Amino acid sequence: MLYQLLGVDLVAVEGLNEVTAQTILSEIGTDMSRWQDEKLFCSWLGLAPHNDISGGKVLRSRTLKTHNRAGQAFRLAAQAVSKTNTAYGAFFRRMRAMHGPMKAIVATAHKIARTVYFMLRDHTPFHDTSAEEYQQREREREIARLKKKATKLGFTLAPASA
Protein backbone atom coordinates (compact mmCIF):
# COMPACT_ATOMS: atom_id res chain seq x y z
CA MET A 1 0.00 0.00 0.00
CA LEU A 2 2.84 2.42 0.79
CA TYR A 3 4.43 1.63 -2.56
CA GLN A 4 1.23 2.63 -4.38
CA LEU A 5 1.05 5.88 -2.42
CA LEU A 6 4.70 6.89 -2.76
CA GLY A 7 6.05 5.11 -5.81
CA VAL A 8 8.98 3.80 -3.72
CA ASP A 9 9.22 0.94 -1.25
CA LEU A 10 10.39 2.37 2.09
CA VAL A 11 10.17 -1.07 3.71
CA ALA A 12 13.08 -2.16 1.48
CA VAL A 13 15.37 0.07 3.57
CA GLU A 14 17.01 -1.97 6.31
CA GLY A 15 15.53 -1.24 9.71
CA LEU A 16 12.26 0.20 8.42
CA ASN A 17 9.16 -1.93 8.74
CA GLU A 18 5.55 -1.13 7.85
CA VAL A 19 4.76 0.61 11.16
CA THR A 20 7.99 2.63 11.22
CA ALA A 21 7.50 3.75 7.62
CA GLN A 22 3.92 4.82 8.39
CA THR A 23 5.10 6.77 11.44
CA ILE A 24 7.72 8.55 9.38
CA LEU A 25 5.28 9.35 6.58
CA SER A 26 2.62 10.60 8.96
CA GLU A 27 5.14 13.06 10.39
CA ILE A 28 6.96 14.24 7.25
CA GLY A 29 4.34 13.73 4.54
CA THR A 30 5.18 12.99 0.93
CA ASP A 31 6.20 16.48 -0.22
CA MET A 32 9.96 16.75 0.24
CA SER A 33 10.10 20.28 -1.21
CA ARG A 34 9.54 21.58 2.34
CA TRP A 35 13.27 21.10 2.88
CA GLN A 36 15.86 22.54 0.51
CA ASP A 37 18.27 19.66 0.98
CA GLU A 38 18.97 16.58 3.10
CA LYS A 39 20.93 18.60 5.64
CA LEU A 40 17.93 20.72 6.59
CA PHE A 41 15.75 17.61 6.64
CA CYS A 42 18.07 15.82 9.07
CA SER A 43 18.38 18.96 11.17
CA TRP A 44 14.59 19.18 11.41
CA LEU A 45 14.53 15.55 12.54
CA GLY A 46 17.09 16.32 15.25
CA LEU A 47 19.70 13.99 13.74
CA ALA A 48 22.26 16.57 12.60
CA PRO A 49 24.93 18.03 14.88
CA HIS A 50 24.32 21.53 16.20
CA ASN A 51 27.67 23.25 16.54
CA ASP A 52 27.95 26.03 19.10
CA ILE A 53 30.88 28.07 17.78
CA SER A 54 32.49 31.05 19.47
CA GLY A 55 35.60 32.70 18.11
CA GLY A 56 36.06 29.95 15.53
CA LYS A 57 36.19 27.29 18.23
CA VAL A 58 33.55 24.56 18.47
CA LEU A 59 32.31 24.64 22.05
CA ARG A 60 29.66 21.95 21.80
CA SER A 61 28.62 19.66 18.97
CA ARG A 62 25.46 17.85 19.95
CA THR A 63 22.13 17.18 18.33
CA LEU A 64 19.36 19.50 19.41
CA LYS A 65 16.74 18.09 21.74
CA THR A 66 13.53 17.56 19.85
CA HIS A 67 10.35 15.58 20.31
CA ASN A 68 10.10 14.68 16.65
CA ARG A 69 8.45 11.27 16.26
CA ALA A 70 10.00 10.78 12.83
CA GLY A 71 13.47 11.27 14.32
CA GLN A 72 12.64 8.75 17.02
CA ALA A 73 11.49 6.30 14.35
CA PHE A 74 14.78 6.69 12.49
CA ARG A 75 16.65 6.04 15.76
CA LEU A 76 14.63 2.84 16.25
CA ALA A 77 15.50 1.80 12.70
CA ALA A 78 19.17 2.42 13.46
CA GLN A 79 19.00 0.17 16.51
CA ALA A 80 17.26 -2.49 14.43
CA VAL A 81 20.10 -2.64 11.89
CA SER A 82 22.82 -2.90 14.52
CA LYS A 83 23.12 -6.67 14.25
CA THR A 84 22.28 -7.13 10.57
CA ASN A 85 24.79 -8.14 7.91
CA THR A 86 24.19 -5.06 5.76
CA ALA A 87 26.08 -1.88 4.99
CA TYR A 88 24.07 -0.03 7.64
CA GLY A 89 24.92 -2.72 10.19
CA ALA A 90 28.63 -2.51 9.36
CA PHE A 91 28.48 1.29 9.55
CA PHE A 92 26.77 1.09 12.96
CA ARG A 93 29.41 -1.31 14.31
CA ARG A 94 32.25 0.88 12.99
CA MET A 95 30.73 4.00 14.59
CA ARG A 96 30.07 2.14 17.85
CA ALA A 97 33.70 1.06 18.03
CA MET A 98 34.90 4.64 17.48
CA HIS A 99 32.32 6.75 19.32
CA GLY A 100 30.15 4.52 21.50
CA PRO A 101 26.59 3.22 21.11
CA MET A 102 24.62 6.46 21.52
CA LYS A 103 26.52 8.38 18.86
CA ALA A 104 26.44 5.32 16.61
CA ILE A 105 22.64 5.22 16.82
CA VAL A 106 22.35 8.89 15.85
CA ALA A 107 24.92 8.57 13.04
CA THR A 108 23.17 5.52 11.58
CA ALA A 109 19.75 7.16 11.94
CA HIS A 110 21.14 10.20 10.10
CA LYS A 111 22.36 7.95 7.29
CA ILE A 112 19.00 6.16 7.01
CA ALA A 113 17.15 9.51 7.05
CA ARG A 114 19.27 10.80 4.15
CA THR A 115 18.49 7.64 2.19
CA VAL A 116 14.74 8.04 2.79
CA TYR A 117 14.93 11.73 1.84
CA PHE A 118 16.51 10.96 -1.54
CA MET A 119 14.14 8.05 -2.16
CA LEU A 120 11.10 10.26 -1.60
CA ARG A 121 12.50 13.31 -3.39
CA ASP A 122 13.83 11.57 -6.51
CA HIS A 123 11.51 8.51 -6.50
CA THR A 124 14.50 6.18 -6.74
CA PRO A 125 14.43 2.61 -5.43
CA PHE A 126 16.65 1.51 -2.55
CA HIS A 127 19.85 -0.27 -3.54
CA ASP A 128 21.18 -2.39 -0.68
CA THR A 129 24.84 -3.26 -0.34
CA SER A 130 26.15 -6.04 1.83
CA ALA A 131 28.48 -5.57 4.77
CA GLU A 132 31.32 -7.15 2.79
CA GLU A 133 30.97 -4.61 -0.03
CA TYR A 134 30.85 -1.78 2.50
CA GLN A 135 33.94 -3.04 4.32
CA GLN A 136 35.77 -3.48 1.00
CA ARG A 137 35.00 0.14 0.06
CA GLU A 138 36.18 1.34 3.48
CA ARG A 139 39.40 -0.66 3.08
CA GLU A 140 40.04 0.88 -0.35
CA ARG A 141 39.48 4.37 1.09
CA GLU A 142 41.89 3.63 3.94
CA ILE A 143 44.56 2.37 1.52
CA ALA A 144 44.15 5.46 -0.67
CA ARG A 145 44.41 7.71 2.39
CA LEU A 146 47.56 5.94 3.58
CA LYS A 147 49.17 6.12 0.11
CA LYS A 148 48.42 9.83 -0.10
CA LYS A 149 49.91 10.44 3.33
CA ALA A 150 52.99 8.34 2.50
CA THR A 151 53.67 10.25 -0.74
CA LYS A 152 53.21 13.52 1.13
CA LEU A 153 55.91 12.39 3.58
CA GLY A 154 58.18 11.12 0.79
CA PHE A 155 57.58 7.38 1.13
CA THR A 156 56.13 4.76 -1.18
CA LEU A 157 53.81 2.00 -0.03
CA ALA A 158 54.01 -1.52 -1.35
CA PRO A 159 51.64 -4.35 -0.40
CA ALA A 160 53.19 -7.10 1.70
CA SER A 161 53.68 -10.38 -0.12
CA ALA A 162 51.84 -13.23 1.55
Predicted regions and their residues:
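A detector of single, family-specific signature residues
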Residues: 1-162
